[in-house]
Amino acid sequence: MIDTLPIPGIEDYDKIYWENCSLNKLSIQHCGDCDKPRFPPRHMCPVCQSVSHTWNEVSGDATLWSFVIPRPPLLPVFEDQSPYIVGLVELVEYKNIRLIGQIINIPKNNLDSIEIGDKLRVDFKKIDAEISLPCWIKK
């Protein structure tokens, strides 16, 4: 059973993403050849198969595309946070890129106030020395 917080592993192709998150910056990987944005970061472009890539910082503004309130929590480690909202958000700069993260500023007694289409802003939750996870605040 998983009883500790699951931490993403850092790979060579997503190291800059995690470094930027630790600096409270959200960035999206682009192909260095065809300039196609992609998320999650990966080693090779799915469009042209180039291994070249660049990074573009984004505003952190997003729209709630979907969400779930897991009941009971998915893992025992999340018991203290329960109930909580996990959102699938669409970045304003990229209508085809969606990220998953916890929505952190909704009181537990008011979880029903969240709606698809709500405007959100990124925030970052420091997990350890290397990892800060993007999470979301309702505007």
Where do the PLM segments sit?
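Short, basic/aromatic beta-hairpin or loop at an interaction surface
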Residues: 88-101
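Short, conserved beta-turn/loop elements at beta-strand boundaries and strand-helix junctions
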Residues: 67-73, 94, 108, 127
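Conserved hydrophobic positions within beta-strands
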Residues: 62-64, 103
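Short aromatic-glycine-enriched beta-strand elements
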Residues: 74-88, 131-133
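Short functional micro-motifs and their immediate structural scaffolds
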Residues: 39, 53-54
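Well-ordered alpha/beta subsegment
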Residues: 100-139
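Residues immediately within or flanking Cys/His clusters that coordinate Zn2+
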Residues: 25-28, 42
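Short, cysteine/histidine-rich loop/knuckle motifs that typically chelate Zn2+
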Residues: 30-33, 47-50
